[in-house]
Amino acid sequence: MKHVIIGMAGHVDHGKTELVKALTGVDTDRLAEEKKRGITIDLGFARLDFPDGSCASIVDVPGHERFIKNMLAGAGGVDLAMLVVAADEGFMPQTVEHLDILQLLGVKDGLIVLTKTDLVDEDWLNMLEEDVKSRVKGTFLEDKPILRTSVRTGEGIEALREALHDLTLHAEEKSARTPFRLPIDRVFSVGGFGTIVTGTLIDGHIAVGDEAQLMPLGNQCRVRNLQVHGRDVSAVYAGQRAAVNLAGIKKESISRGDVLCRTDSMQPSLMLDVKLQNLPDSKRIIESGSRLHLYHGAAVRLAKAVLLDRDALRPGESCYAQLRLSEALAARQGDRFVVRFYSPLETVGGGVILDEHPYRHKRNDARVIASLAVRESGSDEAKLVQAVGERGADGMTLADLAACFDEPEEKLVEMLAVLCARGKLVEIAPSRYLTSSTLDRLWTDCETMLTKYHREHPLHAGMRLAEARQRLLRGKARENADAILACFAREGKLTLTAEHCALADFSVHLTKRQSAIREELLRTCRAAEILGKKQDALCALFDKKDCMECARVLESLLSTGELVLLAPELCVEKSVLDAVDARVKAWFETHDTLTLGEFRDALGTSRDHTLLVLEYYDRRGILRREGDVRRPGAQFGEIEK
């Protein structure tokens, strides 16, 4: 079922609350002060039922200029607008301001309602309609229906209900794919139930039992119960007004303007990159560095507006800007906002968030402007490539992209395949992507790094993988680093072993003397069997003039894995260890455990040397010590290959 929020807007005392009551039977003025003063101070909500069984939620917002903050808190989730104009007064200051706010918040459809028509004659109504048409020209309400109503006589109420029903049928359906998010506009507690928050669910769906988080502080909680218009429900979907009973958190820990969201789906930010607009009828110039009041959802923040491509934003103009906030805010790309002048407090503009987690920008940076232009109006493919590119060597997974883009996974997979075929993206591992430009940059760095390494260590088989990961990718996740190196290997640029990487065209070249030393070292270590040989003993086999060459060849043999360090300085020939591996494997085919004594007897060595060998296997993860015995370790499968 489609869920639609209808927002009432208009000047104070123009009959919004009475109109809601006539449509729904609900008096949305709930506060004693509202009853006493006869004006709406805070938000009111009502359910509007239609004959076909469908329904919509109506948000009644205050019309008095002193309560614009409350009006903004309720307007954030509005799909359709009812602009209310009293027939006996016409357009008034808050009518204009409310219309500006709805326009800034991206509301795209609605209608205009003339109230109190019983107080004026037909000629006046005709003139008023013409005036209203001229006032809404150029806005989303241009050419929209204008309906005449009177709560006192009942005129036009049913026609209005039918018109609203028709609008809801054509309203755009919200996506339930993105993680749920509910900006909180009320928080209170009820005896026996605990903490309750209310708001409009603007993304995703939330269910009883869900784990949730309150931003910007990050406090954890759980959804105990849900209500929509006073009725218990098991789940709430985007576009519905809801009351959420929370467990695990006190009312005092929550403020109006906080956001209830899926755990770890949002991160607060102190900066926002935006497209900022100064209203055409604004009386203010927004200069770079100006302080403004930012209204986002139900939250209010002080913000410093840094204009990125000019010094001042005049009425009717728009530009890219960075808003630097006084307090952290939880937002998402594509969210709308409103800004009001710092003092005096008046609505001057608003816009759309392009990046909720930007770096701090310098002004007049052409690359930043170009990047923001893609975020604002680029194609879906361009936005996807930019999103992946901004993650650099981390890249993005399909799951990452699904969280960022409100698209079905099937469409994302199709777009990714096209972009890979065009050479814009590279799938470095299943469902993990980097931009081609990022991969090219990484290869340039990798080639430079390995060329230098081969020049300095010509007898090494290559750079150790752990060192290559650290130097090339500066501590990125091992899985990602390995995927990038493996990608280079698939392209024929690298050779990879379990321990090393080298340029594909690199090979170790030994002199005749180095080759002779190599053979002697291998023969000696092979003859020593599992006892091995100390490095200084191996170097002592040669004349002093060959000591330096011996050290180089030893280093080469260790890098290629032909010799292995059983313990510091103690070298064992690889085929000897392979034979011991075979014994260990055979032992555990018939035994569950291995003791030091059993291994000593199998090797025919001393107890101390047997312990060295066991500790070597422990370090590799081949074996795992449990008290006085060993069992197969996490890497035992290595010796089965």
Which residue ranges define each predicted feature?
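Conserved G1/Walker A P-loop phosphate-binding module
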Residues: 1-61, 65
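Small-residue-enriched segments and motifs
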Residues: 6, 56, 144, 182-185, ...
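C-terminal effector modules of nucleic-acid-centric enzymes and ribosome-associated factors
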Residues: 8, 120-124, 134, 249-565, ...
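Residue-level recognition of beta-strand microenvironments
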Residues: 11, 187, 204, 226, ...
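Residue-level signature of catalytic and energy-coupling elements of molecular machines
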Residues: 13, 19, 38, 60, ...
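Conserved Switch II/interswitch segment of TRAFAC-class P-loop GTPases
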Residues: 55, 61-66, 76-127
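Conserved nucleotide-binding/hydrolysis micro-motifs of P-loop NTPases
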Residues: 64-65, 88-92, 107, 116-121, ...
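Conserved catalytic-core segments of large NTP-driven translation/proteostasis enzymes
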Residues: 117, 123, 134-282
